[in-house]
Amino acid sequence: HMVLKNELLRRLLTEEMPPEELQHHMDVLGIRLAQDQLMLCLLTFTPCADGRSAYAAQDDPLFDYGVLNIVEEILHESGDGLAGSLGDGIYVLLFSHGGQVSQAKIDARTQNVLQRISFCMRNYFNRQANFCMDKSLRDIAHLREGYRYVTALKQELFYHDNTCVLRSPEEQTQSVLMGLPLETEKSFASALEDGTAYEVRLNEIFDMIETRRVDLENARMILNDLLGVLNRCLLYTSPSPRDRQKS
């Protein structure tokens, strides 16, 4: 089933398909997706700190399945959506804003979907997600143009270290934080566990929130990540009840 959906998405992005054939494939595969006001997005992962590729499917055959399962569940909870793998750690997302005329509501829904996906990728796979968004909504017959656009935009990811959302290469691109950057979280936890508290510079994290002007939801995610690290370190360093009884 997943293989057939991946193939359908590849065809939609690279060749013209008659509407009758498209509808037939969607009916057979049980795909619920409006065919207008579609947002096209590529999902990739930041390479690991040691230089290894972020693509883990070669090590875990269930990686693709897990990623797509989570992404599609989030898309369906927020409305119509479809996701597939293009191979080499590149995933394509389609979600429809059909019937919605408010740009503010379209942007809010898009941001909510990406934030949830980013959060799940970090929590379940320890992967830093990046997103390349099409510059406009399209109907299903014009996805090829959008795919060329986001594929070109993906080259810009080379210049970004943290989770980011890229929309336009013509304008200055900004990194949109999706929670605490993974490397910051790891160094924070390591310093706490080693007892080198002087290396924990909370001011740098708060300065990052201020200078990037992250919204309330993102700030909440960052603070929740900090609390999570502190909680894990407390559990790691606190003596067990048995040890306390001995003392």
Please tell me what each predicted stretch does.
Residues R10-M39:
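Juxtacatalytic helix/coil linker segments
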Residues L29-Q37, C48-F63, E73-S238, R242-S247:
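Cytosolic nucleotide-utilizing catalytic cores of signal-transduction proteins
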